[in-house]
């Protein structure tokens, strides 16, 4: 191991970086396929372009050196961050330059957000609708305006500065990626130092990140939003640097500011309860969470993460060792427990990525549900289009990330799993019990599928025969979700009890309580549950379990199975076990991801359908003269969604009227997308239903015709491989299906307002 030259600071210890390890060459980097000896020769056949895409980021195929792979991944992270900063900059620039943000700030109930104006080239300006006060543009549903208001941005200069700042950050990140690969590249030991990594992530990123955001919320967001809520015009509100250190200005809004830091140092922290609160529920002015609750929440997280970050043994020889924690973690039925997993997670980035993807995918789904039950930003709750979009967006992200977790778990099993390291630990025992696990999971899927779908089939039969008294419904044979109702009641009444003694209210109105109206629209209310909810819940359970069955089977059988004992030698993706063995196709780890994605699509689609209809029926609506609510679909969920016919008639057909009739209106783009995405989806079936041989024969006859005309191409055309065909089919299937449903949702909710 080499040490860095010179300087007393490195004396006696090894350097953590290599200086100038890889020369930077635009000539090399600009050559397609430079990372692969075969690809770098250029295309001989059309297969080259497919292999180029498949292998460009598959660093394992480019080198066996774990340090080099680690450096490439680390460098790529900075490139990824750079792209994110450019994306953020673009959104904020649009808000500053092309939007009605300032009009929306002044009257968020009378204006719809728009940050996109379509140019009138051949009539596309029909897409620009009047979103309020005469501003014509495309209504956006990203939540951009709500988060900018929540952050306290009221001045064009702030938005332009943020947009430019994000571009500067993008350049810095891009340079950092270059610097940490070509100039000073970390050594493998640096990447494998789990304790220092945890300390840095917990204290610096999460702890100080939360603390910094708490500071912003208290010193910028709270005063600006309080002034906006009290009716002060945005242009009359001073920009942050004008009041940041003006305690008199702040004390007028939050009196405890007059006391400065004295309450903090005298442990009289309760004095700050005017801006660090525990109110619960939603602010009746904006329909969002109380900004003071949000500040309190982030302060608590900051304290927790900073304390947690001091847990691990780094420079001073005190604290926990990650390896020791794992090796001492044994249960009565887990053999050697987590022994060996430290080695797994420090030598296989696929294993670590699998855990992170599954975790963050689950977080994304949790975020989707929190965004409507506890809308964090001002006036988000009554912007139904944005509410819907944020739910659908985070559900799809969650689904894809979880499947990605299974993909990298299978890659880990094929490429990185070492049986010698995993002896009788939890991973080894999972593999030894895989037949039991899969057969039980299969039984659960069969049970859930027949019983949950059977309830719907029963109801369709009874309704078709004119026997409503024999249906499963709230008015006949009831299947009430009593446990869910119990949890709702428990949470609705939690404030002031021993479980939440300091809370002034429940965390969400979804648990119970009267509707909260903002501008005459329901921001949130009690989400009542009944037989229809019990039934669709079990459909969700069925689809989740089938998706998990496919993914878990792919992971547990990635290395071997009774059918193909030497599967590990065939790699992560292979079409079949050679030409001599029939019936071995679609058994690779890759194929399980391929199949799992279809079921993930089914699963998330029904979740989104459920959410969209349920909210229209039982939550979203306008206040009527009697103090009640006129719901968008008049509460038809409970009786219509309990039959398959009801789903087809009252949801898919009845609610697609807006997108089907959108031509000639500002929503016509959604009609075009709806039609085009159906075509893309149908086009996918051509790839999924036909085999490679058909296309190769067709190509050869076409090449023959070109040769006769002496216009044969230099690059030999070749049909896609079986795996490539499946990938292209899957991509079109998912793209077509998701865009079809997305355009349907948006056209309807924007038309209803």
Swiss-Prot record:
Q: Which residues bind phylloquinone?
A: 695
Per UniProt, subcellular location reads as: Cellular thylakoid membrane
What cellular component terms from Gene Ontology apply here? photosystem I; plasma membrane-derived thylakoid membrane
Q: Which InterPro entries match?
A: PSI_PsaA, PSI_PsaA/B, PSI_PsaA/B_CS, PSI_PsaA/B_sf
Kind of enzyme, top EC level? Answer: oxidoreductase
Transmembrane spans: 73-96, 159-182, 198-222, 294-312, 349-372, 388-414, 436-458, 534-552, 592-613, 667-689, 727-747
Tell me how the cofactor is bound. PSI electron transfer chain: 5 chlorophyll a, 1 chlorophyll a', 2 phylloquinones and 3 4Fe-4S clusters. PSI core antenna: 90 chlorophyll a, 22 carotenoids, 3 phospholipids and 1 galactolipid. P700 is a chlorophyll a/chlorophyll a' dimer, A0 is one or more chlorophyll a, A1 is one or both phylloquinones and FX is a shared 4Fe-4S iron-sulfur center.
What reaction does this catalyse?
reduced [plastocyanin] + hnu + oxidized [2Fe-2S]-[ferredoxin] = oxidized [plastocyanin] + reduced [2Fe-2S]-[ferredoxin]
Q: What is this protein called?
A: Photosystem I P700 chlorophyll a apoprotein A1
Q: Which organism is it from?
A: Acaryochloris marina (strain MBIC 11017)
